[in-house]
Amino acid sequence: GEIDWFFNPTEHTSHDNEWTWSLYRHIYWQPLARAYALTKDEKYTKEFLHEMTEWGRAWPVTPFMENEEDAAAKYKFPGHSWRTIETAMRIYTVWLPCMEAFRTSPVWDREGWVTFLTLLCDHADFLMTHYSNHKKSSNWLTMESGTLLECGILFPEIKSDWFMTGYRRVMQEVKYSFDNDGIHMERTPIYHMVAAGVYFQCYRLCKLNDIPVPPYMEPTLEKSAQFIMSLVKPDLSTPMIGDADRDDLTTRRCDTSLYEGMNLTFDPYDLNEMRAYFRTWYEETGREDFRFMATAGKQGTPPAQRNYKYIPAGIYVMRTGWGPEDSYFHVHGIQLERGEVSSHSHNDTGHVEIHAKGEDILTDSGRYIYNSSCWKDWRHYFLSAKAHNTLYVDDHEMGTVPGVTRTRGVRTYLHAFEENEQYQLIDISHNGYDFMDDPMFHRRRVVRLPDDVYVIEDRVTGICREDHDIRLYYNFAFGHLDGENGKFDYTSQKGRGYTMTVQADKKLDFEILEGSEDPIGGWISYGYAWRKPIPQLIAKHSGKAPIHFITVLAPAGIRAEAAINGDAATVTLADGKVLTLTENAVELH
């Protein structure tokens, strides 16, 4: 039957506009183009032309060009086709690749070309007069400007200002949107890759057409690829920092979202967009570490560097190596550039993720759903400290500044980032709870010791006048967790056993949730609109700060006994050595 271009199956469940917006991104035309390239069967061309024509009839641009606000008001649900993000995204990820795949088809006749080019002009002209310019999340303007530049380069016969407008915007934004470490201002892997992919596509198109680019463009974009590479875990997946999914270099497709997926670019050789991204960078630079990523470790050489500290972004990564049985942990205190909206950042400062011997142990819970749906309580949960491995206080949104909306003022101070023969250490503090009525301060140290023993120390201080709901949350990867009274046993997906002990210098209560809907707790989302139960441990204290926590995670049978004595926290190991953490020192002797 014919496609209903106004259909949304979530009307009576999540009531989520993202489903319809995904429909308007036309990503399902990519398989038609691939099938035609392989078979030259004209039924695929006919279907592409038919769907394009019918979509154009269903969604003319004129009402949105004349008065976007009034036109959009008619489609609060299920959403409309002419948001600038969809307008831009479908052109560079689908329409232009489909043009390349189908353009020699004898079925694509003059009428089809008139329809295609008319609609393409509608898109580019609409983007000329509708520029989000950081009023929305910055990935919107990335796609808008990239699409204008690509249309300007590929269609010089069409008299327009597309090229110069897109060119100016892209060359300015590629530096404005990425810091000197090559990290995108939204600080989350999939939106980073969206922006990096658009600008890399623009860079390559400029090079192929002898169009000058600024001297900072190529090194900035190469660093953006290095950043994603530095986050990759030993199992070749990426961490779910902020609104990110679990993307995997080893699978047929890297993205598991049911809809609202990554939508990076179109690659003719590989459905896994992340592998394709690194392969293209390998072709561009000849770097063997990019080849290592592009082939999921089968060829090339792993990166020479193991540990990475990104102070401006607030992301810190340590690992034992790049092999499948290596271990990895990261701590983050995401710092958004001043003025950047917080759309895709979570309330998770101090979050620690632990990946031991090639599998996740402590994990980020992912993103699951956006506020475009009616499931606001689920969105709030996945944004909150509860869905991360960090300190929770009174459900306060970290970094909230009174009178300022959609901006996170969290800043992290890095006290130490150190590796020696005895341990690896990441030590941070932050201002996330400063604007509470009774301000509180949080310092976290994460120490990795031999035998994959991890020590997490949390010091919570402040004026300490009021009682608070103070909690530590630990979200475990798929597996089994049980225990009580501060000692818990966890069995991982690979059947490995671990023991976690949690202590404090004040009374603690404990709770384990797994797949709970009331209260919401113990869930993970590897992709948008997808969730599964996981074990979640909560250590709770009701009362005043200060409070001093010490958490130890160790493989089963490995001795690691913790204690708190005054200012010092100690962990006694099997060989008799003692790790001592005081306010100003970390020592193992």
Predicted regions and their residues:
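A residue-level signal for conserved active-site and pocket-lining positions in enzyme catalytic cores
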Residues: 148, 228, 318, 458, ...
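Cytochrome P450 core scaffold surrounding the K-helix E-X-X-R motif
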Residues: 362-365, 369-373
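Extracellular structured ligand-interaction cores
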Residues: 18, 23-25, 313-315, 349-351, ...
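Carbohydrate-active enzyme catalytic cores, enriched for enzymes
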Residues: 183-362, 417-421, 543, 548, ...
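CBM-like, beta-strand-rich accessory domains located in the C-terminal region of large
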Residues: 88, 244, 268, 275, ...
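Aromatic-lined, polymer-binding surfaces characteristic
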Residues: 2-9, 15-232, 237
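Structured loops at beta-to-helix junctions and adjacent beta-edge loops in soluble globular domains
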Residues: 1, 8-10, 130, 319-321, ...
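Short, surface-exposed beta-strand-loop junctions and turns on beta-sheet-rich folds
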Residues: 324, 337, 368-370, 434, ...
